[in-house]
Amino acid sequence: MAAFSLSAKQILSPSTHRPSLSKTTTADSSLRFRNPHSLSLRCSSLSSSSNVGRTRLMRASASSTAPVMDTSPTKAVSSAPTIVDVDLGDRSYPIYIGSGLLDQPDLLQRHVHGKRVLVVTNSTVAPIYLDKVVGALTNGNPNVSVESVILPDGEKYKNMDTLMKVFDKAIESRLDRRCTFVALGGGVIGDMCGYAAASFLRGVNFIQIPTTVMAQVDSSVGGKTGINHRLGKNLIGAFYQPQCVLIDTDTLNTLPDRELASGLAEVVKYGLIRDANFFEWQEKNMPALMARDPSALAYAIKRSCENKAEVVSLDEKESGLRATLNLGHTFGHAIETGFGYGQWLHGEAVAAGMVMAVDMSYRLGWIDESIVNRAHNILQQAKLPTAPPETMTVEMFKSVMAVDKKVADGLLRLILLKGPLGNCVFTGDYDRKALDETLHAFCKS
């Protein structure tokens, strides 16, 4: 059967931030270990058959039933947040999701340790939201003092030099172990602030306030923190969980269209690997998501967080199951590293990487052509690339993938789809010919 189109989709030019200015059920997952380098994962849609402990994991005030959204915008109303719990025993924490949450100071203040706070943000987000966050931290709480450090914006600054600016501010401010770091921004800020919190004085409290779709549905949840190295993305870091994640969906009002689309790549990922019902909902509602329908976005964020929280609760340190959340990331990280950090947004690279992973899955005979076409079509609807940049070569992919974090004993393990939609494997047990064929199909040399 013919493969889908391999033409690279043109990327929208970068844009800056625009100052504007239920009951929940869980997935029933069954794991089968075939060999030390292979994890097979069958994931049904979120169902009510899970046990009571798992249900507590996903507590939420809004229904998980997936309504079909229209594309007409509605005015967001501040109300009690939806809460999704990440169940990690005595290190469990809530994810608050809703509109106007930054106007509810108690949500933040209940998770602040001590009287000293350092807000880590960037030059794009600070002019829009820093004062609001400082107000939320100090309103009715005059004994709390807040410092801030404003970092340059962009993936290319996710490095040791920039990280040192956080440590400089913390040390100059004489912060102690009773302080709290607050990450205010997208995935880069969350990753760096979390790593700084994990390292400063061997670990201090921190809170995530993600302001992009990408960070809200993925990077702020689960405790992955770190920085990039010139030889590879996220090679330096730690697992370090926040005290809470506060997702004020109003922050998406100032998010550029390109950043919105980038975050939707991770939303699509959850549907492909473990939640077929969610994928089908996305197919019906992608126009509403692209039009920023508040109800559609709130549902997509909640459902994504439920999927992520369940996986993290079962496999915090990515020994197997959690690795499946990296569908497309091995190819995508190679694009980001080879093409240059910041040239493509993370979600853009992941989108192209997912198309490559799906293509390889099809070449292995593990999925049928309908899944190939559906994955391709939904990413196109989201205005995301479906092929890597033309400058990427087979050798560039191979050299970067050789140092990927999922390499074990010299064997590159990949997340690939296998079986019906919503099923995947994390494995090193595959025909290398299929990988070569995929790379050559998407690269000119």
Swiss-Prot record:
GO CC, one annotated term: chloroplast
NCBIfam families linked: aroB (TIGR01357)
Pathway: Metabolic intermediate biosynthesis; chorismate biosynthesis; chorismate from D-erythrose 4-phosphate and phosphoenolpyruvate: step 2/7
Subunit structure: Homodimer.
Temperature sensitivity of activity: Optimum temperature is 55 degrees Celsius.
Binding site for NAD(+): 122, 153-155, 158, 186-191, 211-212, 224, 233, 251-254, 308
Known catalytic reactions: 7-phospho-2-dehydro-3-deoxy-D-arabino-heptonate = 3-dehydroquinate + phosphate
Organism superkingdom: Eukaryota
pH-related activity note: Optimum pH is 7.5.
HAMAP family assigned: DHQ_synthase
Enzyme class: lyase
Keyword tags: Amino-acid biosynthesis, Aromatic amino acid biosynthesis, Chloroplast, Lyase, Metal-binding, NAD, Plastid, Transit peptide
Function of the protein: Catalyzes the second step in the shikimate pathway.
Binding site for a divalent metal cation: 266, 329, 346
Compartmental location: Plastid, Chloroplast
Transit peptide start-stop: 1-68
Biological processes annotated in GO: amino acid biosynthetic process; aromatic amino acid family biosynthetic process; chorismate biosynthetic process
Entry similarity comment: Belongs to the sugar phosphate cyclases superfamily. Dehydroquinate synthase family.
Name used for this protein in its record: 3-dehydroquinate synthase, chloroplastic
Cofactor list: a divalent metal cation; NAD(+)
Lineage of origin: Eukaryota, Viridiplantae, Streptophyta, Embryophyta, Tracheophyta
EC code(s) of this entry: 4.2.3.4
One term of GO molecular function: 3-dehydroquinate synthase activity
